[in-house]
Structure formats: structure tokens, C-alpha cells
Amino acid sequence: MAALTDLSFMYRWFKNCNLVGNLSEKYVFITGCDSGFGNLLAKQLVDRGMQVLAACFTEEGSQKLQRDTSYRLQTTLLDVTKSESIKAAAQWVRDKVGEQGLWALVNNAGVGLPSGPNEWLTKDDFVKVINVNLVGLIEVTLHMLPMVKRARGRVVNMSSSGGRVAVIGGGYCVSKFGVEAFSDSIRRELYYFGVKVCIIEPGNYRTAILGKENLESRMRKLWERLPQETRDSYGEDYFRIYTDKLKNIMQVAEPRVRDVINSMEHAIVSRSPRIRYNPGLDAKLLYIPLAKLPTPVTDFILSRYLPRPADSV
């Protein structure tokens, strides 16, 4: 058994050290670089010597990132919910990479809110999240694929453990399940072009995707706009307990995001990137096992975590 463990370790070590050549000449385009994973990845790839094309949502974020890095990083503005913005960014990337193409596209831009019990949300709440996390990701990918194919590079899509098991209502898990399906389908389609597609499925990390507004205030707004009949069916205790549970989840969220950034980097620089990366102990020990259990078992476990509504049977 010890020998098998050693062989497994050596195999993983070899794969992790088996890097692509000429990294300093390769271009990487990353969305969502104002803060969080995208911002840190951009800086880490610059330190590695790669040519980084970073897309930010705000001018402030763009200027700050440019100040914090070197000439190897260039920034542009991108709103992934607007087709014209995506087209402009694609042309900007095309002008930068030229005939060599784009080595890696990293679809990192994302939002997590609004989230909550599905019945408390509106269609617009779902659309707001899905347009960024899924539709925007798809449109960016479609515009960048010719350049990635030219370089025989890779696409790295930011999903989530919530793309394997739906642990919360709202558009977040819905969009991440969509990211998984889209990534799986294009990975198979692009195989013969020599393009690899990787999916990052982090556990619960503390990033700006959770928003700046106080959680209880956000949940109170959702609660107070509900019809009285709906509020009565859940009860005030449900609202209080549900909100407290969300607070607890956020409080135990992992603040050290280095594992996520290293996973993203490995997907970009390794000759043998993995199809899926699951950074975070909660991803490995909780969410992925829950996703693999029989559905009735997963339902039983997760439903026991939810509070019981006033009108429960």
C-alpha cells in the first residue's frame, strides 16, 4: 500500500512539473479581474512571466491592477452581459495576440447574488445571475475560440461546487450547472483541435462574489417584498433560522484562496491539466461526495439542514 501511495505521489508530482514551454511568449485572457480570483491570478501569472490580458468591469479596478503589476499585464474594460462590450474586447485581444493566437481563456467573471429560497426570488433575480455566470461566459467563449484554436491552447471555466450539487436557491447553482454542461460539451467538440477545457469547482471561499451589503439586510429585503400569504406559509422563524444558517456558512468560508489560484494556474501552464479541479476541503469532503450519492440520500441530508416552514406537513 505504501508503494502504491508513493507511486501515486510521484505520478502527480511529474504531472504538476510537466509544464508547457515558452510561457513568457504565451497570452492569457482573464475576465473579472477587478478583485478576487481573477485579480490574484493575473498577478500570479505576471510573476511567472506570462503575457496577461486582464478584463475588468470598472475603470477603477483596471487602473489599480495596472499600477500593481508590470508591463506584462494589459487591461481592458468588459461587461460580459453586453454583446458590444464582448465584441470590442475580442477585437482588442485579437490585435494583441496576432497570428500566434490565445493560449488560455479564463472565464472567471461571476456574481452570486441574489440568492435565497427560490420562491422568494423573481425572474429578474435569476436572470441577473445567469446572464453573468453562464450566458456571458458562453458569449465570451464563442468570440475567443478561433484564437484559442489557433494556439491549440485551453479554456478554463470558473464553476463551483454548487455546479455539482445545488445547495442554495437562486440563479447561482443554476448557472454553475450550466457552466458544467457547456464546458463538458465544448471539451468533447474541441478535442480534435488540440484544445483542452478545464473546470474549476471551488468550495466555499470568502470573496467579493458574496457582495458588500450586510447579509441580514439583503435577506430582509427579499422577505419584506413577498406577498403576505407566502410569508405566512414560511413563518418568521424560518426567515430568522435560514438567515442565521447563511451567516454561519459565510463565517466559516475559507479566506485563504491560494489553492484556487494555484488550481487555475495549473490548468493554464501544465501540459496535462485536469478536467476538473476541486480546491477546498469542503469541496473534497462534502460537496463532491454529496453530488455522487444517490439523489434521495443527498435530498435527505440537505433538507435536514433547512429550517421547517410554518405550513410544513
From Swiss-Prot:
Mutation: residue 72 to W; reported impact is: In ARCI13; decreased protein abundance
Q: Is Cytoplasm among the key words of this record? A: yes
Cross-referenced InterPro entries, in alphabetical order?
NAD(P)-bd_dom_sf (IPR036291), Sc_DH/Rdtase_CS (IPR020904), SDR_fam (IPR002347)
Point out residues bearing the modification Phosphoserine: 185
Q: Name one Pfam family in it.
A: adh_short
Active site per the UniProt annotation: 172 (proton acceptor)
**Which residues are listed for substrate binding in this entry?**
160
UniProt keywords (A-Z) are: Cytoplasm, Disease variant, Ichthyosis, NADP, Oxidoreductase, Phosphoprotein
The EC number(s) given in the record are 1.1.1.-
Q: State which residue ranges cross the membrane.
A: none
Tell me which GO cellular component terms the UniProt record holds.
Answer: cytoplasm; intracellular membrane-bounded organelle
**UniProt keyword annotation of Amino-acid biosynthesis present:** no
Q: Which residues bind NADP(+)?
A: 29-53
Database matches in Gene3D superfamilies? NAD(P)-binding Rossmann-like Domain (3.40.50.720)
Just give the chief location class.
cytoplasm
The family database entries (SUPFAM superfamilies) matched by this protein are listed as: NAD(P)-binding Rossmann-fold domains (SSF51735)
Q: Which GO terms describe its molecular function?
A: all-trans-retinol dehydrogenase (NAD+) activity
Where located? Cytoplasm
What are the recorded Gene Ontology BP terms?
retinol metabolic process; steroid metabolic process
Q: Report the catalytic activity.
A: a N-[omega-(9R,10R)-epoxy-(13R)-hydroxy-(11E)-octadecenoyloxy]acyl-beta-D-glucosyl-(1<->1)-sphing-4E-enine + NAD(+) = a N-[omega-(9R,10R)-epoxy-13-oxo-(11E)-octadecenoyloxy]acyl-beta-D-glucosyl-(1<->1)-sphing-4E-enine + NADH + H(+); a N-[omega-(9R,10R)-epoxy-(13R)-hydroxy-(11E)-octadecenoyloxy]-acylsphing-4E-enine + NAD(+) = a N-[omega-(9R,10R)-epoxy-13-oxo-(11E)-octadecenoyloxy]-acylsphing-4E-enine + NADH + H(+)
Q: State the tissue distribution.
A: Expressed in the skin. Expressed in granular and cornified layers of the epidermis (at protein level). Highly expressed in liver.
Q: So what family is this one in?
A: Belongs to the short-chain dehydrogenases/reductases (SDR) family.
Could you say which disease the record links this protein to? Ichthyosis, congenital, autosomal recessive 13: A form of autosomal recessive congenital ichthyosis, a disorder of keratinization with abnormal differentiation and desquamation of the epidermis, resulting in abnormal skin scaling over the whole body. The main skin phenotypes are lamellar ichthyosis (LI) and non-bullous congenital ichthyosiform erythroderma (NCIE), although phenotypic overlap within the same patient or among patients from the same family can occur.
What's this chain's function? Plays a crucial role in the formation of the epidermal permeability barrier. Catalyzes the NAD+-dependent dehydrogenation of the linoleate 9,10-trans-epoxy-11E-13-alcohol esterified in omega-O-acylceramides (such as in N-[omega-(9R,10R)-epoxy-(13R)-hydroxy-(11E)-octadecenoyloxy]-acylsphing-4E-enine) to the corresponding 13-ketone, the reactive moiety required for binding of epidermal ceramides to proteins. Displays weak conversion of all-trans-retinal to all-trans-retinol in the presence of NADH. Has apparently no steroid dehydrogenase activity.
Task: Give the protein's recorded name.
Answer: Short-chain dehydrogenase/reductase family 9C member 7
Biological source species: Homo sapiens (Human)
Q: Which gene encodes it?
A: SDR9C7
